[in-house]
Curated annotation (Swiss-Prot):
Binds 2 manganese ions per subunit. SUPFAM superfamilies: 2,3-Bisphosphoglycerate-independent phosphoglycerate mutase, substrate-binding domain, Alkaline phosphatase-like. Pathway: Carbohydrate degradation; glycolysis; pyruvate from D-glyceraldehyde 3-phosphate: step 3/5. The active site is at S63 (phosphoserine intermediate). Belongs to the BPG-independent phosphoglycerate mutase family. This is 2,3-bisphosphoglycerate-independent phosphoglycerate mutase.
Length: 514
């Protein structure tokens, strides 16, 4: 390949901007490189939540939505918003997939097992979507419904499941069609890193009704776990009431709308070459319905199929004959590839990908640096190779350690990132390269909630930084949003953004003084 002075787009996952220093792990951390850049390099703040990223107003941003908007350069109506609208305008209750499944189950006198994250978080799911499904079952007078609920505590306060259960019980009083048959923390049910030892007990509970503990109702179970210092996210797979496992002829409906943490559990039912663990039983399902498409290789019946996107940043770079590298550790690999390409599985011409394995630890506060040092080494080697025109990389630390709620560990994570950024810039400088730094959403800048008096483990709605290092250019606007990143990056490369990109170019070349 030719010698290229690379342009690196560095996405610091979960690195938001907050004027308030209190509970702010980024402000508390010792970050000499970041501080120097913030004082001397052009930078602005970008909106990364709510309407500017296709979410409902005031809804916090998240990694999937953030990466899609950075890559697309336009506002994309998110699945969350799309499903909310379908509920409000009546299309949800008319969805042909839901009707077909319920009609078939009524005919065969089989059961519907609805599973998913019971949460008002709006990141992977929303409990209102479950409530809309219950209303539909009630409308169709279908009452053989079993609920298998995953608990959040990550995009919500660590102990908030009882609030959601209260809302669910109110809905069940109105629409008495279902029973709660199991609960389980998302740590087990929604793993995305091939930690099959977490998923196996969930599968055994769903298919055989097996769990270490059994409780008469979900509230009793949760009180027991809280007493034993186990918060929502980490509640082990637990049978509730009478055993109603998934049987031949039954249907499963997974109501999560976000794909990355739904794929593994789905694959235990649908992947013909599954090797994660030995399945004692494999029910022959009449349907496996997913709210959205989780993976084109997982043949679910999809209630809300994907809307294709053309001319995302990766496609534009490829069509201009430029080489690009996507690099991240396991936790965020899907984000810089699948989501960055607009939810598209295909790899563009001259697009290469490197995944650095994430460390195998129970929670990332135990290893705040995660795989950042290995990622940095690999990234520097790629810069020095001069094989790539553009490198898009993600550092997961601020988000993944921020999610643990451990303030000191998150400070360590930020300090590790600062060292990594300094090393990456040295390599870029030596190769005549340029650096754009941003984030997909906030997290580490707000680590405690005075409102709930609990650790703030969720994302925030704060803006994120957009910083340019490399000289010769300046920002023309005082603020923007994530959709402005792709057009601005193309401007640095001298490429006119395609008409599909409605984001603005925020960077302009400095005029030479006469």
């Amino acid at each position: 390949m030719s010698h290229n002075a690379p342009l690196v787009l560095m996405i610091l996952d979960g690195w938001g901007y907050n004027e308030n220093d209190r509970y702010n792990a980024i402000a508390k951390a010792n970050t000499p490189q970041w501080d120097e850049w913030w004082q001397t390099c052009p930078h602005i703040l970008l909106k990364a939540s709510g309407l500017p990223v296709g979410l409902p107003d005031e809804q916090m941003g998240n990694s999937e939505v953030g990466h899609m908007h950075i890559g697309a350069g336009r506002v994309i109506q998110q699945d969350f918003t799309r499903i909310n609208e379908a509920i409000n305008n009546g299309k949800f209750a008319k969805n042909a997939v839901f009707h077909e499944v319920i009609d078939q189950l009524k005919k065969t006198e089989k059961s519907l097992h609805i599973m998913g994250l019971l949460s008002p978080g709006g990141v992977h799911s929303h409990e209102q979507h479950l409530f809309a499904l219950l209303a539909l079952c009630n409308q169709k007078k279908f009452r053989s419904v079993h609920l298998h609920l995953f608990l959040d505590g990550r995009d919500t306060p660590p102990q908030s499941a009882l609030d959601s259960l209260k809302c669910l019980n109110e809905e069940l009083a109105k629409h008495p069609v279902a029973t709660i048959n199991s609960i389980c923390g998302r740590y087990y049910a929604m793993d995305r890193d091939k930690r099959w030892e977490r998923v196996e007990p969930v599968y055994n509970l769903l298919t055989q009704g097996k769990s270490e503990r059994q409780f008469p109702d979900a509230e009793t179970a949760i009180h027991f776990y809280y007493k034993n210092k186990i918060s929502d996210e980490f509640v082990p797979p637990t049978l509730i009431g009478k055993e109603h496992s998934i049987q031949d002829g039954d249907a499963v409906l997974f109501f999560n709308f976000r794909a990355d943490r739904a794929r593994q559990l789905t694959s235990t039912f649908l992947d013909p070459s599954f090797k994660g663990f030995e399945r004692k039983t494999l029910p022959k399902l009449s349907y496996f319905v997913s709210m959205t498409q989780y993976d084109k290789n997982l043949l679910t019946t999809t209630a809300f199929p994907p809307v294709p996107l053309n001319n995302t940043l990766g496609e534009v770079l490829s069509s201009h004959g430029l080489s690009q590298l996507r690099i991240a550790e396991t936790e965020k690999y899907a984000h810089v590839t699948f989501f960055f390409n607009g939810g598209c599985e295909s790899v563009f011409t001259n697009e290469e990908r490197i995944m650095v394995p994430s460390p195998q630890v129970a929670t990332y506060d135990l290893q705040p640096e995660m795989s950042a040092h290995e990622l940095t080494k690999t990234l520097i080697a790629a810069i020095n190779s001069q094989d790539y025109h553009v490198i898009i990389c993600n550092y997961a630390n601020a988000d993944m350690v921020g999610h643990t709620g451990n303030f000191e560990a998150t400070v360590q994570a930020i300090e590790c990132l600062d060292q990594c950024m300094q090393q990456v810039w040295q390599a870029l400088k030596n190769n005549g390269g340029k650096l754009l730094i941003t984030a997909d959403h906030g997290n580490a800048e707000e680590m405690f909630s005075e409102a709930t008096n609990q650790a703030h483990t969720a994302h925030t709605s704060e803006p994120v930084p957009f910083l340019y290092v490399g000289g010769g250019w300046h920002f023309t606007h005082s603020e923007g949003s994530l959709i402005d990143i792709a057009p601005s990056l193309l401007a640095l490369l001298g490429i006119t953004p395609p008409p599909e990109m409605t984001g603005r170019i925020l960077l302009e070349k400095n005029h030479a003084h006469p």
